[in-house]
């Protein structure tokens, strides 16, 4: 079962998050029919976005957008404080041979010429936006760079996805480690040593390690778990929302739809759900609109 934990370690000097996201990424793969390299890219992005979302409170939410200039196009993920994530990729049918390390070549798919941006909606008038250049294209390092440079928190992000031969997801998950102000050199060097020795995160999940055990591997000590929360792929789209969008087109455009096709189909970017509007429904919307 997918879930996320929030924890502290080293007498509260280190804040940590870890998650198993296999089912969540599998749902995205199923909905978007992503090929393996695209699955790894969207899965890593969703996992990191989930953990960034877990740092928020209440109704706060955020959107992550990655545009690296690669063949995959843009990757967009929405996450909130409740463990819900949805995401899409411009070109889901992208796959390459494995790279020199024998891993899915996410860097080649994402590209290295572009930006990673995070827009936070904290319920205030203005959104908080942080943007960094893509430094790696492998995404874990890029999210690390975002946290260090945009949020000024020394951090390490690990995200991984393993894909089955039939394109379904074998394992997915990740961790974020953050050093709080006043962390001593000894703690820092211990964690750096641990990070340099651990196996790839997706391998740890494939082996059956829980998020708690993953953090123990990463930190070199048992973390103090503060909160455990279920996580899932969740999209907030609905037919009502698309009705509102159609109303916004105005009478003429709705009339054109009726005359040209006699119906309309709306598809949600984030979850690929399709909503069909019949001729009668379109006529009702046309008569309702004031524009």
UniProtKB/Swiss-Prot annotation:
Alphabetical list of Gene3D superfamilies matching this protein: Hsp33 domain, HSP33 redox switch-like
Principal location listed in the UniProt entry: cytoplasm
Keyword flag Chaperone: yes
GO cellular component: cytoplasm
Keywords: Chaperone, Cytoplasm, Disulfide bond, Redox-active center, Zinc
Molecular function terms, GO-annotated: protein folding chaperone; unfolded protein binding
Gene it is expressed from: hslO
Residues annotated as signal peptide: none
Ranges that cross the membrane: none
Taxonomic superkingdom: Bacteria
Family membership noted in the UniProt record: Belongs to the HSP33 family.
UniProt modification remark: Under oxidizing conditions two disulfide bonds are formed involving the reactive cysteines. Under reducing conditions zinc is bound to the reactive cysteines and the protein is inactive.
Role summary: Redox regulated molecular chaperone. Protects both thermally unfolding and oxidatively damaged proteins from irreversible aggregation. Plays an important role in the bacterial defense system toward oxidative stress.
Name of the protein in its database record: 33 kDa chaperonin
Disulphide bonds in the chain: 235-237, 268-271
InterPro entries per the UniProt record, alphabetical: Heat_shock_Hsp33, Heat_shock_Hsp33_C, Heat_shock_Hsp33_N
Keyword Cell membrane: no
